């Protein structure tokens, strides 16, 4: 596990993703009127003179603009940008290329810090053009990815992840290679690619230093959540249950530990209880909020599948008791997921019995081949008609 003091050596939290999280909470009905959250956000805005972002969130959250505050912050921004421009001009006239780059970088970072997204993007591109070092170029690209994560600008994120991958192939060091994996993992969570997220996160558990995105316990929490939904049971055991770095942190995250082990140890009632807690957490997370219902549904299916695979048949009553729910609830759940083809079982409501119906892999492959063959044949026939014409 990374030493705690490594956090001080990491990149600056610019933009600060915690502010994006706080702003997101204020969009939810239960937090919309939360005075403490609003005060926390306004304090951060005042401290950094974030005039552009203040205007943005007032529009998005429906707040009344404090015109005096906005005017003061804009004036501070104007003075600071003038000083930064003067420093750039002086460096261009009197100093070397490195000093010119540093002056441009300071302006880029300032524009990013105050929430002027468009100006920050332009300034970072200009700084990138004046940067020769591969490592420094990668740092600028990482900054742009963070800017994209702050605003959830998917185009900005994907373009710069692609650019970072290209630069890494040109010869990036191990620290930046690992940092890119963490950034890719975070974005994979945001777009619901949990399998990719699990791969990226598990690859960097022992080398994590991306404290500009999150602290290490939060990283481990994400890692466990995505690994549980993405990995088969044997890989979950080898990479998470037996992962010493993860287990060390889980001592301080009892809720995550109990969620993980309740599923692995087939304690389904406890699993359901902890899944409800996970649902609340994911709903309040700005990155994964759009997918929290999907995650919870897939984890329910995973729990049902794991139980059903242990039996040829079992009673609805036993299954309901295993999950700590009513027979009516489990009956509705099974009917829904069986009809959708997500569970391989059939329910005898008269006898109150659930019979498993494991698919034969060879038969499934045969049916899939026939289906693909039919599709190919139809396309060939359509193509032949076009050619004949």
Curated annotation (Swiss-Prot):
GO terms for biological process: proteasome-mediated ubiquitin-dependent protein catabolic process. Acts as a regulatory subunit of the 26S proteasome which is involved in the ATP-dependent degradation of ubiquitinated proteins. One of its GO terms (cellular component) is proteasome complex. SMART domains: PINT (SM00088). This is 26S proteasome non-ATPase regulatory subunit 6. Belongs to the proteasome subunit S10 family. Keywords: Proteasome. InterPro entries: PCI_dom, Rpn7/CSN1, Rpn7_N, RPN7_PSMD6_C, WH_DNA-bd_sf. It comes from the Eukaryota. The keyword Ion transport does not apply. Residues 193-361 form the PCI domain. PROSITE patterns: PCI.
């Amino acid at each position: 596990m990374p030493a705690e003091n490594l956090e001080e050596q990491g990149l600056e939290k610019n933009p600060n993703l915690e502010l994006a999280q706080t702003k997101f909470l204020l969009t939810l009905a239960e937090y919309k009127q939360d005075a403490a959250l609003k005060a926390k956000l306004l304090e951060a805005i005042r401290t950094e003179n974030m005039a552009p972002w203040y205007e943005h969130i007032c529009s998005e959250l429906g707040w009344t603009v404090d015109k005096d505050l906005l005017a003061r912050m804009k004036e501070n921004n104007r003075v600071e940008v003038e000083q930064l421009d003067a420093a750039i001009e002086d460096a261009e006239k009197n100093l070397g290329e490195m000093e010119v780059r540093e002056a441009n970088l300071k302006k880029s970072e300032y524009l990013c810090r105050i929430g002027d997204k468009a100006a920050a993007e332009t300034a970072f591109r200009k700084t990138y053009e004046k940067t020769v070092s591969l490592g420094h170029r990668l740092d600028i690209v990482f900054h742009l990815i963070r800017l994209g994560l702050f605003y959830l600008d998917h185009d900005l994120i994907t373009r710069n992840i692609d650019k970072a991958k290209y630069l890494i192939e040109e010869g990036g060091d191990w620290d930046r290679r690992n940092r890119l994996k963490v950034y890719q993992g975070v974005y994979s969570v945001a777009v619901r690619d949990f399998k990719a997220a699990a791969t990226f996160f598990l690859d960097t558990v022992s080398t994590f230093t991306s404290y500009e995105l999150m602290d290490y316990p939060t990283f481990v929490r994400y890692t466990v959540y995505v690994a549980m939904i993405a990995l088969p049971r044997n890989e979950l055991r080898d990479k998470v249950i037996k992962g010493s770095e993860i287990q060390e942190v889980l001592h301080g995250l009892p809720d995550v530990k109990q969620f993980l082990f309740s599923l692995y140890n087939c304690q389904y009632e406890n699993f359901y209880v902890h899944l409800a807690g996970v649902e609340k957490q994911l709903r309040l997370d700005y990155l994964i909020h759009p997918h929290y219902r999907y995650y919870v549904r897939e984890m329910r299916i995973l729990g049902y599948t794991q139980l059903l695979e242990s039996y040829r048949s079992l009673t609805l009553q036993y299954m309901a008791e295993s999950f700590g729910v009513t027979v009516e609830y489990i009956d509705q759940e099974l009917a829904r997921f069986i009809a959708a083809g997500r569970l391989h079982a059939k329910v005898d409501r008269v006898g109150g019995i659930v019979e498993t119906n494991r698919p034969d892999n060879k038969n499934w492959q045969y049916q899939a081949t026939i289906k693909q063959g039919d599709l190919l044949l139809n396309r060939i026939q359509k193509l032949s008609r076009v050619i004949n014409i």
